[in-house]
C-alpha cells in the first residue's frame, strides 16, 4: 500500500465512511493519477479541470458521474492532503434534469434472457427484483439473504442507512442455483470477484455494468442500459402494479419522497388515468364558414 493511499484510507475510516465509498473514492483517485501518469500529490486544480473535460468529452460520462469523481478528488486534496484550495477551483457540473431511461417489462425479460453467462443473469435478476443500487449489490453477503422472512438486508447503503428490501421467491430460487453453480463456495460474499467468481473480495461495480451492456447488445435493445436503469424499472413497474409511493420510498432507501415522486412521471398507468382537460370540452364539429 502506497503512503498516499494509506493516508487517504485512514482519513476515510476516521470519518466513518462506508466500505463501498472508501473503495470507490480510492479507485477514482487512482484512475486520476493513471490518466496523467503522475503521483496525485504533484497534480493540481488545473489537472482536475482537464480531467473533468476528459470525462465529459472522451468518456461520455453524465454530469452525475463526473460529480462523483470530483467528490473523491476533493476529499483527497482538501481533506487528506489539506490543500488550501477553494471548491470554486473545481466546480461541480450542472446536472441535466432528464427523466431516466425505463424499460418495459417485456424488455426487462428480454434483457435477462440475453445475459451472456448464468452469473450475469443472476446479477440482472437481483438488480431488478430488489431495486438495490449497484454498489449495494456488489457488497451483498450470503448472510444478508433472509429466506425465512423473505427479505434482503442492505447494510450501510447510501448515507450509511440499513434497510430491508423484498426477496422474491423467483429470485431466491435463482440465488440457490447460483450458489450450487459456484466452483468455490464463498463463506462471505454473495457475488465473489475474480475471473472464476471465487475470490476473497466481492465483484466491483464494473461487473454488473458490463452485464447490462452486454445483455442489451445481445437482446437488440437500443436504449442505454446500466444497473440504475433496472432500479428505475423496479420502482416504475411497482407503481404501475398499484404500490404506493411511500412503500416504494422505503424500498429504495430515499430520504425524501420528492426523490420517489419522479416515478409518477414515468408510470404509464398514472399518465393514462388522468384525462386531458380538452376531453371535457363540448366542441362543435368544425366546418368551413360561409362568407
Predicted feature residues:
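Conserved catalytic core of the tyrosine transesterase superfamily
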Residues: 1-291
